[in-house]
Amino acid sequence: MSRAPTLAAAAAVAAVVLICSSSTATAADGNARQPPLAPGLSFDFYKRSCPKAESIVRSFVQDAVRRDVGLAAGLLRLHFHDCFVQGCDASVLLDGSATGPGEQQAPPNLTLRPTAFKAINDIHDRLHKECGGTVVSCSDVLALAARDSVVVSGGPSYKVPLGRRDSASFATQQDVLSGLPPPTAAVPALLAVLSKINLDATDLVALSGGHTIGLGHCTSFEDRLFPRPDPTLNATFAGQLRRTCPAKGTDRRTPLDVRTPNAFDNKYYVNLVNREGLFTSDQDLFSNARTRALVDKFARSQRDFFDQFAFSVVKMGQIKVLTGTQGQIRTNCSARNAAGTTMLPWSVSVVEEAADESLGVF
């Protein structure tokens, strides 16, 4: 299999997808089903305090993804990894402290894109300037940026409930490991994790469709290649993967969606039907009787996938949210507020870009 597209080619794909997605996104936003709203959230939360909040986030994401098509998957994954551990409270953004390492240092989060963290801080800073102070929470920025990343990649738009507040603490390393199952997990293990946060089999299949964009590292699926190919893996596809990953421990990446790696569409499910899912956690959705019918349904109908993804991601985005007087509105997304401090310097470490979406199912 060939490596990920060049930056120029990827940018061209992103631009085409952006143009094609506008009418579809508008229609989906106006007619999509909505799960019940968590108490304290609303669709017009910033109507008075920061009326341009959503347009500011949208504009930033559109421009940023045009320059780096891989950022869309990075922002979407960041929202997922935040919500699955301790709820949607932006705790994944917090740097470690004297009390211990932050969530970013846990194995499933080691390959979250540094550029995605930087983008959230950039957006938050822009909102601070445009809205006359720290008004919009980091957790709401995460939710909005994830939605706009889906849209700019050609996926459905959906209304994002707003009003989340930010946690003043991060989860333990063990809680991160418990909340983010590995890509080697099969459906029973995945459902066991999701059932603890009020997500079901339909949510699992729909949210896994986020793998229609992004990259996976060889080490995250090498168990399907060595010592012998997984029998659920298409033989031709297995051969392509072996050329990309010729030995265990190979430090290379490949698209999660072999057909349309930069477009948010239903081809991920077509891949599964053709036994071309990259991870065990992907392919087992088709192998397992409990989830197979949903994979078939989404492979046949992109509309059905988009409708369910929009519903499930909004449902996910309300897991254990902090509202009202709970938590805080951070002045710096990377650090809890200090008493009497209005703005803190950013502290997200700049490290080598990992560009890997693979050390966790989501």
From Swiss-Prot:
Annotated S-S bridges: C50-C131, C83-C88, C138-C333, C218-C245
Molecular function terms, GO-annotated: calcium ion binding; heme binding; lactoperoxidase activity; peroxidase activity
Cellular component GO terms held in the UniProt record: extracellular region; plant-type cell wall
Binding-site positions, heme b: H211
UniProt organism field: Sorghum bicolor (Sorghum)
Complexes and interactors: Monomer.
Active site positions, chain numbering: H81
Site entry: Transition state stabilizer: R77
Amino-acid positions noted as binding Ca(2+) 1 in the UniProt annotation, renumbered to this chain: D82, V85, G87, D89, S91
Gene3D superfamilies noted in UniProt: 1.10.520.10, Peroxidase, domain 2 (1.10.420.10)
The name this protein goes by in its record: Cationic peroxidase SPC4
Binding site for substrate: P181
